[in-house]
UniProtKB/Swiss-Prot annotation:
This is DNA replication and repair protein RecF. It is found in: Cytoplasm. Its main location: cytoplasm. The gene is recF. The lineage of its organism: Bacteria, Pseudomonadati, Pseudomonadota, Gammaproteobacteria, Enterobacterales. The RecF protein is involved in DNA metabolism; it is required for DNA replication and normal SOS inducibility. RecF binds preferentially to single-stranded, linear DNA. It also seems to bind ATP. The keyword Repeat does not apply.
Length: 361
């Protein structure tokens, strides 16, 4: 999968842009605040229905405009696919695929699997469990056809159960929610556990190349005691949940812990090493998807040079080239991305929201 064309209208500081994209590397070079990250964010939004720097649609729509519009053409395995997304200041979204409306954002995500690497991405390693659950859920979404529906139903049931906890006095009054919740929770936990086991070898191999000085280990924690039956646990902890007014255990509390030499990575690794580990996780996940399904991710890398010395930048560049995937990279100067340049690459100069193709030597 690769985007061959990207049209942007009234997104961030970009009034209008029509970009013919390279199947390999697409470099976005410009000063801070020029709009290069906005291009990355437009690509991300086209595949996710939301931006990665803001969850509010109004903040990514250009000043005084009613909506943003994004359109892309995807070079699929068998044919070219047209996709589009628009969103108004009121939050109304419209998803279009091959000229027809009424589609879901999840369909865009299936068509455009992406891995995002940003300076804020350290939260995958030093943030709360929700960021690592999202890592596992990305893999389950792209590998298990029933995952998204089950995950959506789980969120709905947990919300309903938590609301009911504020109103009920006996467990029998909440049993109906649990009878639906329990099989969903167990199924999602099984999918996550299977995915974490399956991808462990890929992560270990990639980390050995990026951080050979550490012995890294990975463990999936499902969100409740592994020796306990989830249904019995919910009933046993009813009074505690009622006092808290939320469900304290379950797949919504799962985690994927990473240790280096037996120590949590966030307590041992430098920022440069954490960035390499984050890149290793994203690369391993993308390569696992390719091996399982034949589909390639798009890799979006914002501020490529931050936290990485020349040797580490070259290592990351070589691994990205080996994926043969489409890559979008932002940098302050062209010199920072010279190790990535090649015959399948294209360089764009971004200044004050204007984007121009730059010739490569």
């Amino acid at each position: 999968m690769a985007l061959t064309r990207l049209l942007i209208k009234d997104f961030r500081n970009i009034e209008a842009a029509d970009l013919a994209l390279a199947p390999g590397f697409n470099f976005l070079v410009g000063a801070n605040g020029s709009g290069k990250t906005s291009v990355l964010e437009a690509v991300y939004t086209l595949g996710h229905g939301r931006a990665f720097r803001s969850l509010q649609a109004g903040r990514v729509i250009r000043h005084d405009q009613p909506e943003f519009i994004l359109h892309g053409r995807i070079d699929g395995a068998e044919r070219e696919i047209s996709v589009g997304l628009s969103k108004s200041r009121q939050g109304d979204s419209k998803v279009r695929i091959d000229g027809s409306d009424g589609h879901k954002v999840a369909e865009l995500a299936q068509l455009l699997p992406m891995q995002l690497i940003t300076p804020e991405g350290f939260t995958l390693l030093n943030g709360g469990p929700k960021f690592r659950r999202a890592f596992l859920d990305w893999g389950c979404f792209h590998n298990e056809p029933g995952f998204f529906t089950a995950w959506s139903n789980l969120k709905r049931l947990l919300k309903q159960r938590n609301a009911a906890l504020r109103q009920v006095s006996r467990y029998a009054q909440i049993r109906a929610w649990d009878q639906e919740l329990i099989p969903l929770a167990e199924r999602i936990s099984e999918w996550r556990a299977a995915y974490s086991d399956a991808i462990a070898a890929d992560i270990t191999a990639t980390c050995a190349q990026f951080l050979p000085e550490f012995a890294l280990s990975f463990s999936f924690q499902r969100g409740w005691d592994k020796e306990s039956d989830y249904g019995e646990l919910l009933e046993r902890q009813f009074e505690r949940d009622r006092a808290l007014t939320y469900t304290a255990v379950g797949p919504h509390k799962a985690d994927f812990r990473i240790r280096a030499d037996g120590t949590p990575v966030e307590d041992l690794l430098s920022r440069g090493q954490l960035k390499l580990l984050m890149c290793a996780l994203r690369l391993a996940q993308g390569e696992f998807l390719t091996r399982q399904s034949g589909r390639r991710c798009l890799y979006l890398i914002d501020d490529f040079a931050s936290e990485l010395d020349t040797g580490r930048r070259r290592l990351l560049a070589d691994r990205l080239k080996a994926t043969q995937a489409q890559v979008f990279v932002s940098a302050v100067s062209a010199e920072q991305v010279t190790d990535m340049a090649g015959e399948k690459g294209k360089m764009f100069r971004v200044e004050q929201g204007k984007i121009e193709v730059q010739p490569q030597d």
